Amino acid sequence: MKVAVVGVTGLVGTRMMEVLEERHFPVTEFIPVASERSVGKKVMFNGKEYSVVSAEDAIAAKPDLAIFSAGGGPSKELAPKFAAVGCRVVDNSSCWRMDPTKKLVVPEVNADVLTKDDYIIANPNCSTIQMLLPLAPLHRKYRIKRVVVSTYQSVTGAGNKAVAQMEAERGGAVWGEYPAKFPHPIDQNIIPHIDDFLENGYTKEEMKMVNETHKILNDNTIGVTATTARVPVIGGHSESINLEFEKEFDLADVRRIWEETPGITVQDDTAHNVYPMCRFALGHDDVFVGRLRRDFSVKSGLNFWCVSDNIRKGAATNAVQIAEVLLQKGFLPSE
């Protein structure tokens, strides 16, 4: 299969190559794509060196699959051009997520929505993916009435420049004397501000979690409210999640459901200090859940803590899993 990775030199693009290798995706011809300033750079894939090419050259090569992590602007411009030559596109930006003509997919949750007519498929927001993996099976069983989520998101979610800012600060750099991704210092700080603020007082990141939840679960009746914050960690995103169900639930059954759900690892043994932590989620594809307990302030409430590597399951791995579904359904060539 002829596969292009668009945005290949970025944090997520690099991880996409790794995940394609690790999962033995059937790539017979690899096309690394990036912006004009990166054309000619060398990348390694499956033990071979490749030169980065322009999007125009990649489109001319007519790939079977293109996995995008190049930002909303390039995706809006280029994804239709790739699709026009018969290429299936899986896009990691927010560009197509709420487009009513495009599917928004977490494979473990709603892979069944994909059809042969889908040529541009949207990869959800990283925080939404890790939240919905544990929520979806509970919603099927108990019907979720309301979700309150607070996120503690790794600097890696803001890209290489954000990581460089944190490393500079930890090295003793003085604020204002180095290129900064964030409007404030991030080291030894928490910034309750991810993406732009909207007129309703929420940020775009917070509203992504609201709107994407409704679309992926195909249920606009669920109440969702979110607060998202950036924290000075590398390993992954953490979320404090409070659920209110429409019917009474059994805590042991919740644990059983999660233990039987692919992609979820339960870490919940507080007697031995076992619970999910982002430092130990790094490099893994599962979503880790723990600190399960009833919310005694409401009749049918559940609290839990949820952690995931945002660059893997929150981005690269989920995108490759979507491609695997397309392959399994026969929408991509097997070789």
Labelled PLM ranges:
Residues 1-186, 221-223, 256, 287-288, ...:
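N-terminal Rossmann-like NAD(P) cofactor-binding subdomain of oxidoreductases
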Residues 66, 155-335:
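Charged docking surfaces used in two-component/phosphorelay signaling
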